[in-house]
């Protein structure tokens, strides 16, 4: 009888261990998440505090993050760290693709509280690229994210002003700058959106930014935003 009791106890312990492991995997899946986001049109997010720590990697296109009064261009191949609680707004230009790893505040790791560009290790870059082709909620994704979690703890974020960053910060509607027509168009339409949100009427926006050409304004809105403003 004692032997049977011991066997039952060992079986119980084994099942409890498996259950705990499965629970841990489930927690990890929700505490660390990977997203492969594609933006066919201009996407302008409202300014808000980050609820999670996030690592952004621009694959295609361009992302622009505003911290305080300064904007920073995140170009293809660059990585940017956004700590939890960071007040920022993000703009994703049309046809952009961005990888993002989110880390919940429930994790007790010592994540950097400084926002900025980071230089990923070869391992971290390989992990992020592998995650883009890995099934969501799979055991492999959980394993990869666990290693990513440890890798990001070694990052040292720093803010830097690239030539493109300086250009975007100096840009004003109608100014004569060395800037691509595509970027100038996107910034102009972003300004139009800002004016509308501040209560400006359509006629005033068209007169200020599009020389009174309403038809051109409406066509460009559908082209860049995918809808009318």
Residue ranges of each PLM-predicted region?
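…primarily DNA-binding HTH/wHTH and HhH modules…
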Residues: 6, 18-19, 218-229
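An amphipathic alpha-helical interaction segment
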Residues: 120-176
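Short alpha-helical "recognition helix" segments of helix-turn-helix
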Residues: 202-209
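Ligand-binding loop in jelly-roll beta-barrel domains
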Residues: 86-117
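A short, Lys/Arg-enriched amphipathic alpha-helix from helix-turn-helix/homeodomain DNA-binding modules
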Residues: 164-200, 222, 226-227
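Short acidic-glycine-tyrosine-enriched beta hairpin
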Residues: 69-81
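Short beta-strand segments in beta-sandwich/barrel cores
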Residues: 54, 60-66, 79-80, 88
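Generic protein-terminus/edge-of-domain signal
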Residues: 1-62
